[in-house]
Amino acid sequence: MKERQQLICIFDCESILDTELIRRVWNLEGEDFEVSKEAMKKQFEESASEFLPLPFHKVISICAVITDHFGKFIKVNKIEGESEAEMISNFFKFIDKFSPKLVSFNGKNYDMPLLVLRALKYNIKASTYLDTISDKWNNYKSRFNELKHCDLFESLGAGRGMRLDTICAMANLPGKYDVHGDQVLELFYQNELEKIHEYCESDVLNTFMLYLKYEFIKGNLTEEDYANSLSLMSEYLQEHKANRGYVDIFVHCSDEEIKRILEK
């Protein structure tokens, strides 16, 4: 039987505050949006940051780019689910079924710890991701190891101010084109969940392009490999995501990057 090649899953999560937990722990009252803003205000007064500890967050979107083991683009989409629990369950089931290589930007510090915390809330099994016994030195939880989970934030230095948008701007990649992370809370309470999914998809496309560039400068991709992967992404976006506002930006950026690579 032919051995199945490992997929690569470049992923990102978006979250808002868990107002139910905030009410229970902090005794705040009011509508969800007001409770969220008040909690952020209190957190800022205590720590000079509005970002609450991870247990106070809940997941509202998970999106992923899927490629083959060589980085050739297959698709980008949101992880389906009628509820937070179903969405997270589907994500961990995907990991259980395919054991993909994960790629993220700060996913070892934010996305995956958050998903595991919410799995605890809903009693969702994450056995493959949490398995540190079968291979002690090569598992999803290994630090400073890119074989099972390449966290580009970690790989590129993990320094203060290392933001995906800034790195993309420096590296001639699209970056954030419309929505920024601090707008997600307001968009959610304006019933703009699809806009959040679109933003999350654009983030994973940026991460995918940054990952390709990283693999290229490491010597793992030739110029032709790199250009081909970008071309496949552009073709997919134009055929399957024509209604997304980010398509023209990513296609143009991809075309320009291909020119730079092949004209060297």
Which role fits each region the language model picked out?
Residues 1-264:
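DEDD superfamily 3′-5′ metal-dependent exonuclease/proofreading module
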